[in-house]
Every structure is written in structure tokens, then in C-alpha cells.
């Protein structure tokens, strides 16, 4: 978001959570936020969050979790905050890590009923509505590399997707959002014109954005999740926003599985 910390309405939401915790006193709490929360305002924002939780009697454990480590092809780093009033092992701070929990998930995920994909190619549909394809007018802009104030390479056809955003329906440059050429999709990644063509040549190819169905699948939801939403009257823009704001199903499942099976 705007990274304004507690100085915006969304930042104040944390104190509503604290009020709920003080009233309901749950033994376990799991919170999720962007990875930059830990460094925001030179660490003072996170220190306040930790202080408020500890004042309610919680022990607090955190790490940055990457969706790509949980059998979903999306680089999505998020801060998870686990807090509990229950006893935990003395070394639990070293146990509650992305690497450790991902290693456990790696051993068991195939029997858990979660959805898993090795590459974005596993979820890309061969045929989609033409409205998802980029217009000839907009392609050169979206394919251009970042400006002087935002230098980043605008590559398409990423086998491991960039992090989905709540504003992806606005179609940012390819250095921020995910776009795919039709020949890359049809060849299951065997043909990747990014490696051989200039940006001008790429702009001549059929290139499209993710569909809402594909966006939700990258977050670990079933293929029909967006379809059901659309059938209920939810517009594509809202579906994209929901997918971008969602937590990755597999990541949260893996954390809860680890906590429950280890009787934390």
C-alpha cells in the first residue's frame, strides 16, 4: 500500500485487532502483512506491534514466508506473525521459519488436498477471451523498462510469477505485473521469444494478462473459485483485487499444519 504505517486507516486496523484479542483472549493468533512492515519507520512500527501483543501476554514469532516455497509458482514474500499464550519449545524462534515449515510441507503436500503447480505454465489456459489480450496501442508502454525513477526490467513469460497485486487489473508495466505471449503458452514454455526478440518485436506478438481464474490459482484456490464469483455477479476488477489481496492458501495451510502436527 502507501506504507504510511499507523498514519492511515488501514494501519489503525491493527489496534482494532488488539481490542478483539483483549476481549476474546484467543490462545493463538496468526497475522499477515507485507515484508516491509518489519523495516517500516526504521523498525518502530513493527516494534509497536510486538509490544502491543506482548502486553497482552503473547509470545511473538515472525519470519518472511515466500509463496514459491509452498508449491505455488509465485514469488510472494509476506511477513507472518504468530503469537501464542501457550508454552512453546525453547528453540521455537528457530523452528518458526519459512525454510523449516516449507521443508515439512514438501514431504506431505501431495496428500493434503492442496493445489500445487511447478510453473505458471501449469495454470495458463490455451484459449481465453480476447479481452485479456493487450491492445496494440498499450503493448509498447507495458513492455518498456522502468523509468528513471523506477528502474526495473520488464520481462514477460515468467515461469515463476511476480507477486500478484490488488491493482493488477489496472495493468502496470511488465516489470510489476505478469504477461504472457501466446506462443509461450501454447509451447508450455519451450518457445520464449523474450530470449531472442527485441521489445519492438515482442510488441507485435499476441500477449495477454492473467485471467482472474489464473490469478486465484496462483494463490492456491481451486480453478472454479473465480468462475463462481463471476456467476454471482462479481466483476473482473473486483476478482483481480480479491486475488491480489488474498493470502496464499498453501502458505497458511503449511503453517497451520506444522503448528497442529507439532502440538504447538
Predicted regions and their residues:
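Class I S-adenosyl-L-methionine
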Residues: 1-171, 181-182, 186
Amino acid at each position: 500500500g502507501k506504507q504510511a504505517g499507523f498514519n492511515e486507516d488501514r494501519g489503525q486496523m491493527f489496534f482494532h485487532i488488539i481490542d478483539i484479542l483483549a476481549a476474546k483472549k484467543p490462545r493463538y493468533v496468526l497475522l499477515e502483512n507485507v515484508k516491509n512492515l518489519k523495516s517500516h519507520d526504521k523498525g518502530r512500527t513493527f516494534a509497536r506491534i510486538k509490544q502491543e501483543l506482548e502486553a497482552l501476554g503473547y509470545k511473538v514469532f515472525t519470519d518472511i514466508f515466500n509463496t514459491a516455497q509452498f508449491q505455488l509458482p509465485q514469488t510472494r514474500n509476506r511477513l507472518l506473525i504468530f503469537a501464542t499464550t501457550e508454552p512453546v519449545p525453547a528453540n521455537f524462534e528457530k523452528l518458526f521459519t519459512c525454510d523449516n515449515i516449507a521443508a515439512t510441507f514438501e514431504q506431505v503436500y501431495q496428500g493434503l488436498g492442496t493445489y500445487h503447480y511447478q510453473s505458471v505454465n501449469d495454470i495458463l489456459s490455451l484459449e481465453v477471451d480476447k479481452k485479456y489480450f493487450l491492445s496494440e496501442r498499450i503493448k509498447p508502454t507495458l513492455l518498456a523498462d522502468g523509468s528513471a525513477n523506477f528502474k526495473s526490467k520488464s520481462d514477460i513469460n515468467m515461469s515463476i510469477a511476480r507477486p500478484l497485486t490488488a491493482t493488477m487489473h489496472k495493468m502496470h508495466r511488465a516489470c510489476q505485473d505478469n504477461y504472457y505471449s501466446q506462443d509461450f503458452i501454447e509451447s508450455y514454455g519451450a518457445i520464449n521469444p523474450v530470449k531472442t526478440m527485441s521489445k519492438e518485436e515482442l510488441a507485435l506478438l499476441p500477449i495477454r494478462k492473467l485471467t482472474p481464474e489464473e490469478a486465484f490459482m496462483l494463490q492456491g484456490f481451486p480453478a472454479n473459485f473465480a468462475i463462481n464469483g463471476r456467476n454471482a455477479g462479481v466483476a473482473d476488477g473486483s476478482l483481480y483485487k480479491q486475488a491480489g489481496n488474498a493470502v496464499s492458501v498453501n502458505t497458511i495451510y503449511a503453517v497451520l499444519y506444522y503448528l497442529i502436527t507439532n502440538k504447538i
